[in-house]
Amino acid sequence: MSQILDTILLFSLPASGKSEVRRYLASLTPEQCRNDFHLGPTLQLDDYPYVHLMHRLDDELKAHGLGYAYYHGPNRPFRDNWTWAVLIELLNEDHANLMASRQVEVASAAQHLMDRLDAAHAKVGLAQPMGDLPHRLRLKVAQALEAECRRELDALNRQNAQDKTGRTLVIEAARGGAHGSAFPLCPPHGYETAFQTLSPVILERAAVLYVWVDPAESRRKNLERGRPDGQGSILHHSVPMEVMLGQYGCDDMGWLMEQSDRPGTVRIERITSQNNAYSTKVYHLPVARFDNRGDLTTFVRTDEALWQPAAVEALHAGLKAAFDSLAG
């Protein structure tokens, strides 16, 4: 039997094809995934739902006469760039709950999300705006978001309850830096900060599948995929252009690969403390590029019945080469 990959960090710029890759994998039989891609049946974690729900919280705060808590505006970047690290802390928590098969049972999913957001902000040294809301206003905001938050929490709970034996976890995220930035990117931008924030439990089990597209192509596809009513959708949301240029104008994955002392890996140095002393822990995560500069993935957004065999074959072959590299 081929080696089953434990955890895949599915990373790339927005609209590069990450979600389409996930959808394509979901269309395959377990035998195809195992034999061609070294994958067990997949479990999925993604930080985009939190990006969307923070926008929704800001919408409700504005509707009640308050300022935005998380963003400079509905189509603008985060108020504090360290919110990128907040998203990783939320993924760390989701991962811990998944591995523990934990069922999160709360009276209000929206109130629970507010508490989680504040706790994650505190971990990276940011203010906790939801805790400062007047009680009656917080109840109104929670009521407006309860249905959306409940859907997300229920989905996580359903996944947490599943048997993890022989499964592959796929964690999806996009990171980058401003157009024209020099490397290394300054924290908290880029994948370097994401790797510095991810739980060691994840790093010890993970490999990186990097979906490679040019930033200009990422911007084009971002506009192409967007739908005005699709901001809550993984496949059809669109990132504002200010964010695309200011936060995703480049990324540092290629640079990190070049800096590694082991070919085919990214090297991550983490400072740890033990016995009242600091030391360095080094991780070498296997990494493979799936070259999507020729756009092998857009067709996956359409109905599966419309997929053309030649397009499927090209996508399958490209992914197989990348996963074979990760499996060694």
Which residues does each PLM region occupy?
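Glycine-rich phosphate-binding loop of ATP-dependent small-molecule kinases
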Residues: 1-328
